[in-house]
């Protein structure tokens, strides 16, 4: 066990244009090979496309999509007496948002389409409406947790 104190939880910074923490979290997850300016370009293009598609505030669409994909509960593999059980555990809001962003980006990358901005905007609009691969992933996780409710006492 570590003798050092627990690390302070860092507050997420907000992005320069929209002053939104979710946008910055999205940028940091989409980042590849340290190319942050390219990540910002992709996000801002996706936000513009959302604005064109829905004709509403794109940040509210983003918030709605992330809220829709954020899981309340997940499963964790736990080894008990030689067999591995999927134990359902509740997750906090920060970890839930991080998972939601990861699932949204994975679903966007899988989508067929021209470029990442187009694919991301389509996935975000679908998630805000309650459909799409990311929503399906959340429902699948919740189903797994529900199926393994009997192992909840192994926590």
UniProtKB/Swiss-Prot annotation:
Keywords: Chloroplast, Plastid, Ribonucleoprotein, Ribosomal protein, RNA-binding, rRNA-binding. GO terms for cellular component: chloroplast; small ribosomal subunit. CDD domains: uS7_Chloroplast (cd14871). The keyword rRNA-binding applies. The keyword Kinase does not apply. It is found in: Plastid, Chloroplast. GO terms for molecular function: rRNA binding; structural constituent of ribosome. One of its GO terms (biological process) is translation. SUPFAM superfamilies: Ribosomal protein S7 (SSF47973). InterPro entries: Ribosomal_uS7, Ribosomal_uS7_bac/org-type, Ribosomal_uS7_CS, Ribosomal_uS7_dom, Ribosomal_uS7_dom_sf. It comes from the Eukaryota. Belongs to the universal ribosomal protein uS7 family. One of the primary rRNA binding proteins, it binds directly to 16S rRNA where it nucleates assembly of the head domain of the 30S subunit. Part of the 30S ribosomal subunit. HAMAP family: Ribosomal_uS7_B. This is Small ribosomal subunit protein uS7cz/uS7cy. It comes from Coffea arabica.
């Amino acid at each position: 066990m570590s003798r050092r104190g627990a690390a302070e939880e860092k507050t997420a910074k907000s992005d320069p244009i929209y002053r939104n923490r979710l946008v910055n979290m999205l940028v940091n997850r989409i980042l590849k090979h340290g190319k942050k300016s390219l990540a910002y370009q992709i996000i801002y293009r996706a936000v513009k496309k959302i604005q064109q598609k829905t004709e509403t505030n794109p940040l509210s669409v983003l918030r709605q999509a992330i809220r829709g994909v954020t899981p309340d509960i997940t499963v964790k593999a736990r080894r008990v007496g030689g067999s591995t059980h999927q134990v359902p555990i509740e997750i906090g809001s920060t970890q839930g948002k991080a998972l939601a962003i990861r699932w949204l980006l994975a679903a966007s990358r899988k989508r067929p389409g021209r470029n990442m901005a187009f694919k991301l905007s389509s996935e975000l609009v679908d998630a805000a409406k309650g459909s799409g691969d990311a929503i399906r992933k959340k429902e699948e996780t919740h189903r797994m947790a529900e199926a393994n409710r009997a192992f909840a006492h192994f926590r």
